[in-house]
Amino acid sequence: MAEGGQAQQQPPQLGPGAAARGMKRESEVELPVPGAGADGPEPGLSKRPRTEEAADGGMQNEPLTPGYHGFPARDGQGNQEPTTTPDAMVQPFTTIPFPPPPQNGIPTEYGVPHTQDYAGQTSEHNLTLYGSTQPHGEQSSNSPSNQNGSLTQTEGGAQTDGQQSQTQSSENSESKSTPKRLHVSNIPFRFRDPDLRQMFGQFGKILDVEIIFNERGSKGFGFVTFENSADADRAREKLHGTVVEGRKIEVNNATARVMTNKKMVTPYANGWKLSPVVGAVYGPELYAASSFQADVSLGNEAAVPLSGRGGINTYIPLISLPLVPGFPYPTAATTAAAFRGAHLRGRGRTVYGAVRAVPPTAIPAYPGVVYQDGFYGADLYGGYAAYRYAQPATATAATAAAAAAAAYSDGYGRVYTADPYHALAPAASYGVGAVASLYRGGYSRFAPY
């Protein structure tokens, strides 16, 4: 009975050892088997090799039925999270039907179970490739934010591009609307405004063309104003330094005009803006006649009255200073002064007629100058004509000097006869005929200086 009681108490003693079956302990290895009798060593011997085999980690050699050795059934996945493989998470093949072909770039492993979740977002995520190891919850939560971020960046970039394009367009419009003036120098003297406009018109719209002239003609430079500053810069780059009719033109940006406060001389009544000294050079007998006007103011007893037009009396003094022999002073001198085309003086004009068929109308420019009836007579007009057209070929030395004085008395011709570049004939040949020959002899009034 005692052995039977020990045999009945044996399973409770083996209970704690059986609970920790998978762990190797020294007490369990050296634990003697109770109740080892004549027929008892065989269970003990069969128990020790199985314990050592289990201690060596031979889990793969266990029988497929867990309750074969009288132990409670163990959970094969209880403490095995670190050593599990991805196959352990895969559902059995029988629970999943065959997946359809991939749609919209989604991998085949997400075809069936997630088509309902992504049914509304497949069109939005055509370009997104999902990784197989990323949870779908995180993907679905991150992808809209990423998409919104990309959209925000795209909109910001589009706004930036739009601002830049607007800025560039405004700058282009400003540059197009800003006119620019170019200074063109060393151009041919025969060039006129249409020639300069034709030369620069190929680069853009031109607002204004101006060539600077003086009384002799072109000064060899001018200005061209473009409507667009870019066209002006392009024209300056292309035309600067080019050779036009043997002259190397220069094109530069025109600087601002510098207005100097020059002291203006009081202009005369007929438009002359000359000082008395320069005026005496242009017309010496004008200022010589003023002395005779002073003689007129001496009194009636020293002069001979002449009846003029409209009852106006002009007195010719009896005292006469012989400037030119045979010339009746002062009436003819004062009338000749007014006769000398004062309405054309100071301007570049064509060849003044050598023979004045019809005298001009009276210009009330100088006091005391009144046309007389006798001026149109043969005596006075013939004397004036003889003075103007005296030919030195049949004259003596005195008349040659008079003819030279006559040439100097012409206010406009005097400039050319005194010019050493144009007066190439000897002094005896001076006269109106010589001045006219200068015009006929290829003299260009557009000479530079």
Curated annotation (Swiss-Prot):
Annotated Polar residues bias: 77-86, 118-138
Tissue specificity of this protein: Detected in brain neurons (at protein level). Detected in heart, brain, embryo, lung, liver, kidney and ovary.
Induction: Up-regulated by androgens in cultured motor neuron cells.
Record-level Gene Ontology MF annotations: DNA-binding transcription factor binding; mRNA binding; RNA binding; single-stranded RNA binding; transcription corepressor activity
Modified residues (Asymmetric dimethylarginine): R356, R388, R440, R445
Annotated PANTHER family: ATAXIN 2-BINDING PROTEIN 1-RELATED (PTHR15597), RNA BINDING PROTEIN FOX-1 HOMOLOG 2 (PTHR15597:SF31)
Protein's recorded name: RNA binding protein fox-1 homolog 2
Organism lineage: Eukaryota, Metazoa, Chordata, Craniata, Vertebrata
